[in-house]
Amino acid sequence: MTQNRISRRQWLKQAAGFLALVPAASATLEAALFRRGALLTDPQKTYLNLFPSDPTKYRFTLEQDVLLEEIERTSFGYFWEQAHPDTGLVKDRNLASGPDERNVASIAATGFGLTALCIAHQRGWQDPLQIVQRVKNTLRFAFTRLPHQHGFLWHFMNMGNGQRAFQSEVSSIDTAIFLCGALACRAYFDDAEIQDLAGRLYQRADWNWLVRGEKTIAMGWTPENGFLRTRWDSYSELMMLPLLALGSPTHPLPPEIWDAWARPNFEFDNIRYIGAHAPLFVHQYSHAWFDFRNVRDRHADYFTNSIIATKVHKIWCLELASQFPDYTDDLWGITASDSPHGYVAWGGPPQMGPIDGSVVPCATGGSLPFMPEETMRVLQTVREKYGARAWQRYGYVDAFNPLTNWYSQDVLGIDAGITLLMAENARSGFVWDHFMKNPEVQHGMSHAGFHAVEASEAHPRPIPEFKSAATNRN
């Protein structure tokens, strides 16, 4: 939740709704936004990734691993301290310096929090019995007391009683993030009640209700206006949605749902990839749980696609160094976050929002498995160079601007969550290894047509490097 009560997905939904209502504006905006990044003219021809994902795990240095441990552990502190002890609902945002009086939770932050509890239990950061009890409290409350529509949950709610907050929608993607957290717990904890509750929550979700004769999944529903007009019909963080729906043992959707969403082809500096008019997080979220390494469907190798998209994002940031000289090889990364003027869904390419030289740590934190060496350099720089201004009780502040000396006062649950989960995946593959043990997850990916990447499908080629003029600037 933001200072003006709008989330990243709500911002994108509103933008999508505006463009859907005003086609001429959509065309004009597309032309204005793309500048050097261009949408390829044949959207039906899906790009075959030329850089197959590498199964070799990056080896972090001891110094890097110590920092990652610190990042993860402090991020976990958010999910432990800013969750209601009885309901388990995790606060949407909180002061970076410590507890505050806000009481609005987000169901997505709660899903990240459930997964964080698995990681903390495995790494010994908190009493294991207390962790198990917190997981049980969360799943019990969600199943027995949290209001729902056909198994789908409010985006935002009061963390003490679960009642709807801010007139928010019943959100398909945020419920999916919660269900991913629940299924991670089911796979990790050897506890009959946890496994039963997580399974029931997943089985309760009626995916057919979200489709209702359409080819794609609805973004959400409100009692005032029914289903939102915008749908999950183009590449974004959506992949977890159809995969969970395909694997459902109770309300499955047909395999056609996987092919129904568009996969637009983008090109930047002669590098092609599947992209979106959206910030960098769309290339991260589904990858936090689903292991797309070394597998592909008939369209693409999505893990490699995220590597390319992240590489392109870095190049784009460095090309902005003439305007924002703090952007270097050691400091880059923008995604939806706080800004001095409220919450902004910014990033690129193509440019979204009023880029002003800000840095968003979860942009690189959430990209750790894709570019471990290069993202670690950024995280180390922020920790060492900007100190207590950019690093507080729960780790990195949500965003900061070294050019204007502005620092966000808050931490967002989903931003701390994506950093924590992807850091652990980059270090050990822990979340992937456990989440993928769920048979429904395997069935979903099988129904979507995923198979191992074959040598004949890959034609390796170096991804172009870019060095900014300010690369070594101190």
Protein language model features and the residues they cover:
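Secretory targeting signals
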Residues: 1-6
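Ser/Thr/Asn(+Pro)-rich, low-complexity disordered segments
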Residues: 39-474
